[in-house]
Amino acid sequence: MGTATAYFLTQRGVRVTLIERGHIGAGATVASFGNIRRSGRYLPQMPLANRSLGLWSKLETWLGMDVEFRATGHLRLIFDHDGLALMQQFRKDALDWGLELEVLEPKDIRKRFPGLGPDAIAASFSPDDGSANPRLISPAFAGAAARGGATIHEQAHVSEISKTASGFEVVTSAGTFSADLLVNCAGAWGPDIARRFGEEVPITLAGPQMGVTEPLPHRILPVVGVWSKQHGAYLRQVERGNVVFGGAVARTQVGADGFAKIDPHNLSKQLQEVVKLVPALRQATIIRQWSGVEGYVEDMLPVMGPSGTTQGLFHAFGFCGHGFQLGPGVGDAMAELITTGSCTTPLAPFDIARFSA
């Protein structure tokens, strides 16, 4: 969120200093699956998701880099009647938010997506959704922001933040910086910054368990997921042939060192669910697993908008593992809000003041 916000602010003529505690893109983004989806999303996020989807196809031109955005569609398989009911209710509700899902019967799945979900009783398909490369997007935004005049400091650990007569002062291991405005895009650590200004946000830190196979013949075009009340599996095949997968098991806990670690004992259970989506993966070799820290706000909605206590402070954090698709829209919306004082995309559901009521 930080690099996208920095980029869109520079496009509006704002001088930006971006302070990164680690390396660009090494936080929740790099742990992301890379899913560009609106299907199954919390409905209050849909206007923001629609805004973001309209930007993804323009990023290669704007950022000067192919971030591997591909609108391959998002297929969500259904294996039981609970999943079918979930899909039907969401499909009905989502119509008012600008999303229309195709409903597929088993014969449609076999014809359009052979080899996927042979035991599925139905599926939904969102043709405009897809995926992008989470390892490329943050560096691409950061590079474009720098070319637009932004100053970027990596491995800059913040020790103090204070409100001054003219704005804010931030003391870091890379020096002390002053600015008129402060944007808190600190991800899972966003509540720590908000707390400095008297704003509490209930959040839990956890990490997804992700994995990737060896390169395989390219057979899986859409992103594939499941409609389920449980932690359903999901996967996609990248252009190099590797299949990236996740879900189906509980998120890993974050240790005292601030890192999320995978639990290798969960891999067997995870793969059992993955092969339900694509049985041909039963013989695939897993070459790597990973995780990363994500912040899950108590009500599973992000914090986004102006501070409720401090003039000139803005927040954009806590996207609960659903933020990758939203990133460009968040950056664009925050830049609009900061430079004009309002936003054409509704942000009220994400107001930090909801926790002080």
Stretches with model-predicted labels:
Residues 12, 103, 308-357:
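C-terminal lid/capping helical subdomain adjacent to the catalytic/cofactor pocket in oxidative enzymes
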Residues 67-78, 90, 101-106, 110-148, ...:
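Helix-loop-beta segment of a Rossmann-like dinucleotide-binding subdomain
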Residues 10-30:
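Glycine-rich FAD pyrophosphate-binding loop
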Residues 176-222, 345:
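Central helical "cap/lid" subdomain
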Residues 215-312:
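Active-site lid/adjacent beta-loop-alpha segment flanking the redox-cofactor pocket in flavoenzymes
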